[in-house]
């Protein structure tokens, strides 16, 4: 098979984006359908590809990143890759659904955010309509595509989320590594928005500034602007497994539904916190933010969910602020500086939710409470069950609300069984930002990646 290399002189354009686009266009015209981007860029004589604008991908196209380093060009404000029909009228129809797009990394393939262009979410609030939206800062951005595969790529200090999907189906995301240090707001890893279905997300490593993997189906904003006629708002049938990562103050796995969109048929198997940073929570279902409180959620908005095999030292192991049905969470172990094992927010309601096999071995003196359930006298709890819980040491077992737990073993209680008051936990989020709200922050980082720069990691404790 004839191989097409983007570095060939016949494809050279005014910049690296045009060069790669020329190679992609030729691969489409000839039916070869594959472009290799090598490490060395013959046009510039450097082992670097600077992309000032997005490369638009047609259907039946494979991009091989052969150990190359792709970077957002200075002052650019565009994606690196997106599908050709995105943001077109055709792309909002079933007839315009693209298919069979692959981006495969070989060797040490990197995608780099480069020098930030200074456009943040706050910038849009301060200057509405002046700049393109934040979705244009995302390196890999796709809408209305089926049969996709992205794997074998490392992401370094992306300007916003690293990957984003709307209305895509039958997608494999595998062997992706993130090194986002929380320098900027919303440095998520993978974001699935409305209309995503039949995804497998696996073997994800590294650390992110915000959520590592987020399923946020919100029926407004870009999800509304990209709405595909004939597809629903719902995100469903998603499998997430073997996530070995941490977040700077946010969730390792995050679920959120708003505006009438739903999420269902979800499986998560294997979350391991790497302690590179302080994750706010290993698992966040819903939110406690009043901004998302209207309209009230239904039990069927978040349903048919299985989450198992979670090992974490995050501030809160599990956080639930959602109305949900038919949910199973099992085999959760906490260690290190974990402060709350399970946090139920005031808006938590459920029908058939079970949490079982919870082991709390947090660093001595760190675990404030095993269960913290906000007060809500009108809360609907039907078939709510917690069982098989072992706690090595905690200040309190219950905070704010007590409820039945089957087979609960607590080896050491430092202060009391129950306390009827809220506390404010310190937050790691935002303390790591080099820039936030469009401004440079000075001396904002703690001396290490824990809450106050003094807590020791499990490895440090084991070495003593």
Positions of predicted regions on the chain:
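Extracellular/periplasmic carbohydrate-active domains that bind, remodel
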Residues: 1-464
């Amino acid at each position: 098979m004839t191989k097409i290399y983007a570095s060939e002189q016949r494809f050279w354009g005014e910049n690296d984006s045009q060069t790669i686009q020329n190679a992609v266009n030729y691969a489409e015209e000839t039916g070869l359908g594959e472009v290799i981007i090598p490490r060395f860029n013959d046009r510039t004589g450097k082992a670097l590809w600077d992309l000032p604008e997005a490369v638009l991908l047609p259907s039946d196209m494979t991009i091989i990143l052969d150990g190359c380093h792709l970077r957002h060009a200075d002052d650019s404000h565009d994606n690196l890759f997106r599908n050709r029909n995105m943001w077109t009228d055709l792309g909002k129809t079933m007839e315009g659904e693209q298919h069979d797009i692959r981006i495969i990394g070989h060797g040490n393939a990197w995608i780099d955010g480069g020098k930030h262009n200074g456009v943040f979410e706050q910038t849009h609030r301060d200057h509405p309509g002046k700049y393109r939206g934040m979705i244009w800062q995302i390196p890999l951005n796709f809408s209305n595509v089926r049969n996709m595969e992205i794997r074998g790529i490392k992401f370094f200090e992306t300007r916003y989320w690293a990957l984003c999907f709307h209305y895509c189906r039958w997608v494999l995301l595998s062997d992706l590594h993130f090194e986002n240090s929380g320098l900027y707001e919303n440095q998520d890893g993978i974001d699935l928005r409305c209309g995503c279905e039949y995804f497998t997300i696996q073997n994800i490593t590294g650390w992110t500034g915000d959520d590592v993997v987020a399923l946020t189906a919100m029926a407004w904003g870009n999800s509304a602007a990209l709405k595909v006629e004939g597809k629903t708002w719902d995100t469903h049938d998603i499998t997430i497994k073997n996530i070995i990562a941490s977040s700077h103050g946010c969730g390792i796995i995050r679920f959120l539904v708003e505006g009438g969109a739903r999420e269902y048929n979800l499986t998560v198997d294997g979350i391991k916190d790497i302690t590179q940073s302080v994750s706010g929570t290993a698992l966040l279902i819903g939110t406690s933010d009043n901004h998302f409180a209207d309209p009230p959620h239904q039990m069927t908005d978040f349903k048919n969910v299985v989450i198992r095999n979670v090992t974490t030292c995050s501030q809160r192991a599990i956080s639930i602020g959602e109305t949900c049905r038919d949910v199973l969470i099992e085999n959760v172990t906490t260690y290190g500086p974990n402060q709350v094992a399970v946090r139920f927010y005031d808006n938590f309601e459920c029908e058939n939710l079970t949490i079982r096999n919870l082991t709390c071995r947090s660093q001595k003196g760190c675990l404030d409470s095993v269960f913290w359930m906000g007060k809500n006298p009108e809360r609907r709890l039907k078939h709510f069950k917690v069982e098989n819980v072992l706690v090595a040491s905690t200040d309190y077992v219950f905070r704010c609300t007590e409820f039945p737990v089957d087979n609960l073993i607590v080896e050491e209680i430092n202060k009391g069984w129950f306390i009827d008051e809220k506390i404010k936990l310190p937050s790691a989020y935002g303390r790591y930002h080099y820039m936030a709200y469009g401004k440079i922050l000075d001396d904002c980082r703690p001396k290490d990646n824990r809450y106050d720069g003094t807590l020791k990691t499990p490895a440090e404790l084991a070495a003593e």
